[in-house]
Amino acid sequence: MSWDAIIIGGGHNGLVCAAYLARAGKKVLVLERRGVLGGAAVTEEFHPGFRNSVASYTVSLLQPKVIDDLQLHAHGLRIVNRPANNFLPLPDGRYLLSAPGRTQAEVAKFSERDAQRLPEYEARLEIFADVLRAWALRTPPDAGVAGGWRALPALWQMGRLGRELATLDASLRQELLDLFTLSAAEYLDRWFESEPIKALFGFDGIVGNYASPYTPGSAYVLLHHVFGQCNGMKGAWGHAIGGMGAISQAIATAAREAGAELRVDAGVQRLLIEQGRVVGVALANGEILRARAMIANVNPKLLYEQMLAPEQVPDATRERMANWRCGSGTFRMNVALSQLPDFRALPGPGDHLSAGIIMAPSLDYMDRAWLDARRNGWSREPIVEMLIPSTLDDSLAPPGQHVASLFCQHVAPVLPDGRHWDDHRETVADLMIATVERYAPGFADSVLGRQVLSPLDLERTFGLVGGDIFHGALSANQLFSARPMVGQAGYRGALPGLYLCGSGTHPGGGVTGARGHMAAQVVLRDL
């Protein structure tokens, strides 16, 4: 049987792409290696009676256009905003809480000057976030096209981009450029004097970024994490009722209703090439499937290094993938709790327990964590962000009990000295629990069960090469027209008939649906 399009990988972007193609009348097949759709955006039971978002764990970047076009709310998706964005408990018993209408007063506890500067800082970031929101649903200019008429679309796109940037004054254009090149610490030093305040905001610069907040380029990662929105509120974060898998299931329902076929337990072994063109796939079970368009919703490194033979990949692409930087320093845990944690800095229940709880009191602490991971393999004083989604969603745990997501950094994607993650996973998990215990005594005793995912587990389970949650670092040389490489930023792969729609394409990582949407538009133009 032949298809108009086959999508490799049933993660949320692959499902979005399938839905748009099927709605346009195309015959579409999605192939997912695992037994469940959603890729890293899945909800599973990890301890009897306890369910949680296994890998990706929070909502902000999901594109409103995708939600509206695919009518995801009508397909069961319900997202609730967090009452507070972030909570930063400090070892000395103080704390900072970032929440609508409350952040400035919280900042004033540490610095009146910083509190006065905060509105201008937020307004400035919002200007740049609006730029990113506009770019997120646009195909980057293809800087790899040679001259002549073929270059006209790229030249038009570049001209449009230039005209839009010209609406910003020169100082804002300079500052936007700085955000792509400066470290998060350098950028925050321009605005604030208080270390806890810089830690509260600077944490966004190292989320999924195996780097220090002093690493050049980390300011962009900070910006990447503030351009989202939730239920129409810019910069807000939320929770999908039922976990992140509810997003994938709503998209899958939309795709099925449009006519797409979705298959699980259907791992792709290799691509089929005929006369230099990608024409189909061979599955792990030996089945051969053909299509006019093959769309890869996988890390580009996995695509070009594992699904194609070296001689089938153009030299420039092979070289680029050899240097494609993967590894986000991420160690992921889900824990079942008998009760809510009780923080020394802010005892008792409250909105802070529904926030992102950041256990990393300063930029210097984050810097030491990164340096220690590079030397030791993992930070002995790690960075832990904890979310307790059951405070907003009682479907995840038994009455009176809770689940928590622990997003932990920094850990080396590959351990030094020949050590193996399978031998050290539980030791590092104990360290992460102990880190939370320092801020919330009694936490360790409340843990009823846990799920532990090292970088190697994230790669084996979800295809996240090096455990990289973004399918490749969000560094300046791996963004926009260079994501995944010059000449392929327009969602067309290295060979005719091959397309890309995963997080290794523009606009980068996160549960956005943007890549699936834009890749579908390119495929529809070509078919």
What positions do the PLM features span?
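A glycine-rich dinucleotide-binding beta-alpha-beta segment and adjacent secondary-structure elements
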Residues: 194, 198-214, 377-389, 438, ...
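Conserved FAD/dinucleotide-binding core of flavoprotein oxidoreductases
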Residues: 108, 245, 301-306, 338, ...
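A conserved FAD-binding loop/helix module that cradles the flavin
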Residues: 503-524
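Structural core of flavin- and non-heme-iron oxidoreductases
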Residues: 1-36, 40-41, 107-113, 167-172, ...
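Active-site/ligand-binding neighborhood in enzyme catalytic cores
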Residues: 126-258, 464-478
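Mid-domain catalytic core of redox enzymes
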Residues: 239-241, 260, 267-397
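Extreme N-terminal leader/targeting segments of oxidoreductases
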Residues: 1-5, 23-24, 479-481, 485-486, ...
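N-terminal glycine-rich phosphate/pyrophosphate-binding loop and immediately adjacent elements
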Residues: 2-148, 474, 518
